[in-house]
Amino acid sequence: VLSTKELPPTPEGLVELERKKREEGPFGFVKDIGVAIVEMPRGLKKMALVYLFQWYAMNVFWQYLGLMCAVTYFGVNLSDPGYAKTEAFNDASGFATGLMVAYYVSCTVVALYLARLANRIGPKHVHTAALCLAAVCLVLLTRIGSPGHTAVLYLPMIGIGVAWASITGVPYIMAIEMIRKERRGVYMGVINMM
């Protein structure tokens, strides 16, 4: 932000924007979004499908991490009506919070370097590797620890954090390469809706 030079619109560009606003009315942006979705480049349509699955997977992960830890590593029995009030469940919840800290820290650190890596080897390769890493780490999360040895679970959480850094940034790098310069704004909004 500090090193990016702002390019203000030209007077002619401002006149054109005002004309377009008058012609399209207050809801012209809805038409613009609809046209963008219909005319979406094939690569972005493929990305939309990937987004569907990655966001679903991450939502399931966020919702069930604590329960998975409770059942798999802390011996909580979900059929017990008072399981949420047990000490084991509280311990599992605290442990899951610690895992999420590792996830967020790794995501933050990796995000600082991911764009450079994507520029060097290509965003498609970086994102594919990150999603594969996430898949492996999600499986490992339920397989590599044991009730007495839960510290090893921080390793897959770091991998999932790496994937999250990619999920929240690299698709925009890929998209910018597919979109005409004058349509970038609307398509960035469409990607945010995915």
Per-region residue spans from a language model:
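Intracellular loop-helix junctions on the cytosolic face of multi-pass helical membrane proteins
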Residues: 1-60
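Loop-to-transmembrane helix entry
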Residues: 75-105, 152
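Hydrophobic core of transmembrane alpha-helices in multi-pass small-molecule transporters
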Residues: 150-166
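Helix-to-loop junctions at the C-terminal end of transmembrane segments
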Residues: 109-123
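Intracellular juxtamembrane helix-capping segments at the cytosolic ends
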Residues: 166-180
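Loop-to-transmembrane helix entry/capping segments in MFS-fold secondary transporters
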Residues: 93, 179-191
